[in-house]
Amino acid sequence: IIANYGAGFNNIDVTYASKRGIWVTNTPNVLHETTADLTWAMILGTARRIVSADRYVREGKFQGWGAKLFLGGDIHEKTLGIIGLGEIGRSVAKRAIGFNMRTLYHQRNRLPKEGEQELNIEYVTFEKILRESDFLTLHVPLTEATEYLIGNDEIALMKKTAYLIHTARGKVIDDYALVAALKEGRLAGAALDVYENEPEITEGMSELT
């Protein structure tokens, strides 16, 4: 038996395991609150430039207060876009209520009106969620439909002031397109928990601050 620690199992060749008579199990519905917390840590950290500011101080560069030094961006009353409203996406949406955000979501199947009202969320098209989100967070599984869901064309639709948050599966984003967009100032920032070709970090990613 291969008992996978987590809900996803795309790291296992299930077809081959089945041929060899090996059972494959996963552990769904145990980490969605934890991952939602991580998502919000990444939203806050990226918007407020916490990691960059911490590195700046530790490197001995801090020379005193500056009005625009690591100014960052606000979260309160901004627009949050959630792509994929499974258990993690819903938990992320619940936390957005405390920031009085306008929360948009997109997935294949729309929730009943009661579910949308409970989470204070609005269903929109894929194009609209790209265009209107100040913070776009991804919570989809890796499938043929979601592989490279976000690439050059999708980033081109996003605001230059937008932040992209990624805690799903690496190949949902074209990392090279993301690196180029960040270097060229076509996005305000990004926070990634996963990479396209793990364990390798995409070329150019570590140079970004």
PLM feature spans:
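Rossmann-like dinucleotide/phosphate-binding beta-alpha-beta segment
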Residues: 65-160
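Short glycine-rich, flexible loops that bind phosphorylated cofactors or substrates
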Residues: 10-11, 143-145, 172-173, 199
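Rossmann-like dinucleotide-binding domain for NAD(H)/NADP(H)
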Residues: 24-25, 161-209
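Phosphate/diphosphate ligand-binding glycine-rich loop within oxidoreductases
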Residues: 1-58, 72, 164
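Short glycine-/small-residue-rich Rossmann-like dinucleotide-binding loops
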Residues: 7, 134, 140-142, 168-169, ...
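Rossmann-fold NAD(P) dinucleotide-binding segment
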Residues: 1, 13-16, 145-164, 175-176
